[in-house]
């Protein structure tokens, strides 16, 4: 499974913003030699990278180093990634719509970042949406949590207030899919 450079480029940016240059260096030093060669200077946003080596493991290292193993770091990293993409390269996408508009397109967004992957929107109405990831061969809890954090911030950016994202089913827990229940005001 692979991840697009646009998804991984935000990790070192997030770490540097939150934990400074020293934190970024500590994190980079903890990575595998292959990942150290790419992070942070050589990430190409249009390239595809092996998911485990360049997203899953680096996120876990970040959570271990700066959050005492708490996956809250993955959530915060997902929020940062949404800011980066939805206020930057995909700004027009958000400006045109509402949280409902954005969530209706969730199925087309996920495969832009992860391949192979599939997401479908089961329900989308004012104040609530249910999205299901039905295909994601190398799902990891740290990735589900990062995706949930991304969704939360995307809802805020598109005008939703007090968003709440719950992972109600999880591929990592043996469920046939990962399900995200999003609510907002």
Give the ranges of each region predicted by the language model.
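Amphipathic interaction/junction segments at domain boundaries or subunit interfaces
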Residues: 45-146, 163-164, 169
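Short, internal active-site loops enriched in acidic
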Residues: 32-33, 137, 170-173
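Short, non-transmembrane amphipathic alpha-helical segments
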Residues: 145-159
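N-terminal leader/assembly segments
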Residues: 1-68
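A broadly conserved amphipathic alpha-helix scaffold signal in soluble, globular proteins
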Residues: 13, 107, 111, 152-156
